[in-house]
Amino acid sequence: PEIVAAFETAKKPGAALHLMGLLSDGGVHSSNEHLYALVDAAVAAGVPRIMVHCFMDGRDVPPASGAGYMAELVDHLERAASKAPDGAPCEISIASVEGRYYAMDRDNRWERVERAYDAVVCAEPFRDLAAVAAMEASYGSEVTDEFVEPVALDARGMRDGDAVIFFNFRPD
């Protein structure tokens, strides 16, 4: 019922659905399949704007495997958007990318979490890059998945009236 309620909220004029969590098939904190199922369900429900915030792993999977996961996600999002019911508009974006070091800090280090928060909520810092290019730029700077610097790839940010689903399944 809560997921359906989030979809209904996101269908209101000007609203968006934000999906956030670890982009990994490591199976410890999340599953890519759960993310894909949420995207597909939101599209089928007629949610017109879906924004995905990718927390990169690098601990439960190899440290530079994120670009591959990102490419798979991009492919899935493109296919999903094309399946919107009755030709309804469906805009799906990868809105931010950040390493789990920032987005999933368990040690109360606000300076880390604040950087992820700014990328997710405020869309700062914004970079006009494709998601896979953002990962490749990180690798080019010798920064692996866990430590990817938080960056917004969609300038909209989060707004009052938006819906948020956090898809990690481990509580910490």
Question: Which stretches of residues belong to each language-model region?
Answer:
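…; additionally, a secondary subgroup of soluble metalloenzymes is captured
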Residues: 1-172
